[in-house]
Structure formats: C-alpha cells, structure tokens
Amino acid sequence: MKASIYEVTISHARSAPLRNVFRYRSYLWLVDLDHLPRVPWLARFRARDHLGDPRATIRANLDRFLAGRGIDLGGGRVTMLAHARVLGYVFNPLTVYWCHRADGSLACVVAEVHNTYRQRHAYLLPGVRAEVPKDFYVSPFYPVDGRYRMSLPEPDASLALSVRLDRPDGHSFAASVRGRAVSSRALFATVLRHPWSTAAVSLRIRWQGVRLYLRGLPVIPRPAHQPQQGVQ
C-alpha cells in the first residue's frame, strides 16, 4: 500500500446545554505502519506522538498494545489514519488503526484519542462499528461518562468517520470526518496548501473552548489521569 492523503472536512456538533457547531477543512494521511513515508519538515510519523514507548516504532507499540489484550495479528498489515508532524508540530484528536490478520481479514480497530493536555487513551473496537464507554477526559465541558458510538470504516477512495457521545442526561456530542483521497500528483500540492493544518486543528479546538466558556458553559474539573497499559 502506498501512503494516501485525504482532503477532509471535520465537523463538531454539541446539542446542549448550549448548541454549538463548527467545521473546518484539513487533510489526513493514511499510511501502512510497516512502510511509513518520510518527507522531512512536511510529514513525519514518530512513535512519541502515539501510543506506547517513544523509543520503539509505532508498529511495535501497537502490536504490544494488542498482545496485552490477547490479540496477535501474525504480522498482518496495519493502516493508520492521522495527522503527520509538520514543521515540528502535530496534534491528533483522533488516530485510527485498522488491524488486519495475516490473511488480510480485519481483526480489530483501535481508536486513539488525544486531549489538549498531552494525554491519550486508546479504545479497542471489535470491528468498524462499535459502542464503548467513555473512559477519558477530553472536553473541559463534559465529565467522563456516557458512551461513544463509533463508525470507523476503512477508507478507500472516500473517507467517512463518525463518533457520537451519548450522555446519561440526554445531552450529546457528535464529530465526523468526511473527505476524498487526492491523486498522487496532487499530494504535495495538498500538503503545501495547508502548511499549518495540524497546528490549526489545535488552535480551532481551543478557540471553540474559549467561546463556550465566555457563553457561560461551566468547566468540569479534570480528574487524575490513569494511564493505560501500553498507551502512556
């Protein structure tokens, strides 16, 4: 598999107690963890930006994470959808790994979530659609409760991911990522057209947080983070 780039629109929608919707354009890489592209300054993929030991490889760390949960891919292919480190910076609210067995069948999906406090948490899904309890503090306006409904089909020519949080009080939050793969000829043009894309993701999320705070939404204190085995 060659690395691919998807030009995407990312949407966030909060229903209550304050309604807030925002969208922004960006791009994401889909890469094979055994054949990571190296484009200095414009695209770097480092283990320290993802789950596990920063001294190992991303692939080795993912295999270790899965082994700790009784899963052995037998050397099967793993593809990762993520922002690359660009000009020394990266922020990935969500990184998705599609984990295949040696025969090519899908064994599981891993959804790695990062917050703006440099913490991470990985959710192991049995397939591309699953429901899991929320176990990680992400937004300062939501407690750690509720359940995520994730739909994370592996991309082909198009990309369509969605995550919905349903909370006990009936309030919900939804995020989606939709886009299309760009041609190999347009790959570098896409990167150059969005040189600060990954930094802009972090800035937009923080700015929306400031807006919600100024509108009177109360901040939920951040609980002590309990690192997962093989993640942080």
Feature annotation, model-predicted:
Residues M1-Q232:
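Mature, function-bearing regions of proteins
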